[in-house]
Amino acid sequence: VHQGDGQTFSIQAQAGQFFQNNGISFVEPWLFGTRPTALSVSLNQSLVRYSDAYGSTQKLNIFSASVGLNRLLRWPDDYFSLYTGIQYQSYDFNNYPFQFGNTTEYNGSAKNFSFNVGLSRNSAGMDPIFPTQGSNIEASVKFTPPYSLFDKKDYSTMAAIDKYKWLEFYKVKLKADVYNTVVGKLVLRTVAEMGFLNGYNKELGAPPFERFYVGGTGLFGGRFDGRELVALRGYENASSTGGTIDDITPYGGATIYNRFAAELRYPISMNQTAKIYALTFLEGGNAWNSFGSYNPFQLKRSVGAGIRVYMGAFGLIGFDFAYGFDKTINGTEPAGSRTHFLMNQSL
């Protein structure tokens, strides 16, 4: 790699009590040598392993490979960028529960070949740690080929585990972050985001993977088992299955979610070596397992305060204290007080 061209080669390894995640990636930021066009290539291997209440080992192994292009655009203005990519994933699970339609399966395998397209506009300025003006708006779609529309199989008589040998779905996400200086150094950040997952064939519906799990901050490991974690402070992190007494995510994961937040931020120190700011927030969101049960006005609400510390050697570290006003799915009382720890996460 020629020095000074900005190429990045990285090796990543993460481990916790129940997971291991290893990956390598390469980024070429000037693929065509003119307007910035970044080529990214990555390989990743994840293993989730833990024991259930009966002492049996539950295992999930995921391999993924992806290639993507991110290009800065000149139209409609210079703040826009377009991402296109392809991804291959394989899932192998043993004694690990996944919700396949109305059936829970514990052993099997599945493959996922998907296309990704994302359009974003980022005018939030040069400081990603403490923006004071502008916005970051993103829209993306992830989709697979519609295999079931061409293979002429009768999925109504097929076993649940056999329906998803090759996953088919489309997944749409929207997110808007807006920053405004209120007075002096006080900054208001407002956030709105949503996601929707579905299949092409009503006999298949949404797949058991790629679902949304809402709650807490999702700090440790959940992103490695075929799901997407969505933060909602004031509530517990989503469990591995969803649907427990502490969950706001339905059993088997959600196919629709909404989240809204408003944060007031005030800088304590903006030194180059350490940036520190305090914040207070209002937040609301929820997750649903079907469009029929979707209600955008039925939100789980919370309020809280926190602090963020950014240091180059450690990245962004944060502590939030939150109170959830609403009941969980199977709870009888408000969620109550929660303390959240964050590390290099954008909520």
Identify what each model region corresponds to.
Residues 61, 168-172, 298-301:
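Short, glycine/acidic-rich beta->alpha junctions
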Residues 1-136, 234, 240-241, 317, ...:
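Gram-negative/organellar outer-membrane beta-barrel architecture
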Residues 281-285, 308-314, 320-324, 346:
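Short, loop-centered acidic/histidine patches that primarily coordinate divalent metals
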Residues 99-268, 280-281, 288-289, 343-344:
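C-terminal outer-membrane beta-barrel translocator/porin domains of Gram-negative envelope proteins
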Residues 73-80, 182-188, 271-273, 315:
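Secondary-structure transition into beta-strands, especially the periplasmic turns and strand N-termini
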Residues 285-302:
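Outer-membrane beta-barrel transmembrane domain signature
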Residues 274-280, 295:
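Generic long, charged, amphipathic alpha-helical segments
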